[in-house]
């Protein structure tokens, strides 16, 4: 049985970014990482790349000698805005089944050169199921252009505020929960995006879809916000995100009980 690369790590939350935000020159490394590959049912491969920006600011590196893939073409629609922190699955590339296995991403910042492994199709890098889903999420293999980073819809999740963090990742996603009318509820959304299209901005929005009263969000344009409900009842809320080309959204149901009612 061949071994596969297994990733363990904490969940990352991305607060909405804008391409117009100020960026600075890198003084710390931006480590590139090869997340691994998926062998698709149609015989093609999906290759996934990410990065870890150790700077305390977002860093912009334009395509060219300092941000390129080898072999050519160097510009494969890879990210040019490197958000601070670690970001897996930032670039997913679909390649034909006869792909030779030679592809490296190279970035030069802070006077140093950083690159991904050359062993693209090493069996150790074949992704496990959960990572496979993230690497291929939003990909239409029949329409995806080959050999370039494909823009995918933002990935969205809302964390259940009443979840047991020790019960496993599958229990963290919220579909419904209850609160009391006299309480302000925390809505902990998570939005991840690949930074494509280039020079675009990611727009995030909370809104009320239904309910007997009105919902007031403290910060409706951020994934993490707080909400107050005007009257008791059942409400449906939606967190959406768009990168100007693709939009994704998740819905949750919140049951608001009167203070003297049990949850």
Question: Which residues fall in each region the model found?
Answer:
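Proline/serine/threonine-rich low-complexity linkers at boundaries of modular beta-sandwich domains
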Residues: 25-28, 145-166
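Extracellular acidic, Ser/Thr/Pro-rich low-complexity tracts
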Residues: 51-55, 190-197, 210, 243
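Short, solvent-exposed loop/linker segments at the N-terminal edge
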Residues: 39-41, 173-185
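Short tyrosine-centred short linear motifs in exposed loops/low-complexity segments
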Residues: 43, 97-103, 231-235
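Residue-level recognition of secondary-structure-to-loop junctions
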Residues: 39, 97, 227-231, 244
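Low-complexity "stalk/linker" and mucin-like segments enriched in Ser/Thr/Pro/Ala/Gly
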Residues: 79, 173-174, 196-199, 207-223
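C-terminal edge beta-strand
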Residues: 248-258
């Amino acid at each position: 049985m061949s071994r596969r690369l297994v990733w363990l790590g904490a969940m990352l939350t991305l607060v909405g970014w804008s391409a117009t935000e100020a960026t600075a020159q890198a003084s710390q490394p931006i480590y590139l990482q090869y997340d691994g590959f998926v062998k698709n049912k149609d015989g093609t491969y999906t290759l996934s790349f990410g990065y870890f920006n150790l700077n305390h600011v977002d860093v912009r590196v334009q395509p060219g000698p300092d941000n390129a893939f080898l072999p050519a073409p160097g510009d494969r629609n890879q990210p040019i805005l490197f958000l601070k922190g670690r970001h897996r699955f930032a670039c997913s590339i679909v390649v034909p089944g006869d792909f030779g296995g030679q592809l490296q991403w190279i970035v030069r910042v802070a006077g140093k050169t950083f690159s991904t492994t050359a062993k693209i199709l090493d069996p150790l890098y074949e992704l496990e199921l959960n990572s496979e889903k993230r690497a291929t999420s939003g990909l239409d293999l029949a329409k995806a252009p080959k050999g370039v980073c494909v823009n995918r819809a933002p990935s969205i999740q809302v964390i259940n505020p009443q979840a047991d963090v020790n019960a496993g990742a599958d229990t963290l996603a919220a579909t419904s929960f209850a609160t009391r009318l006299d309480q302000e509820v925390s809505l902990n959304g998570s939005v991840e995006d690949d930074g494509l299209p280039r020079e675009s901005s990611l727009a995030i929005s909370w809104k009320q879809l239904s309910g007997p009263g009105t919902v007031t969000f403290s910060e409706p344009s951020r994934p993490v916000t707080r909400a107050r409900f005007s009257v008791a009842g059942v409400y449906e809320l939606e967190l959406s995100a768009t990168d100007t080309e693709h939009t994704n959204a998740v819905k949750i149901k919140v049951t608001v009980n009167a203070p003297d009612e049990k949850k």
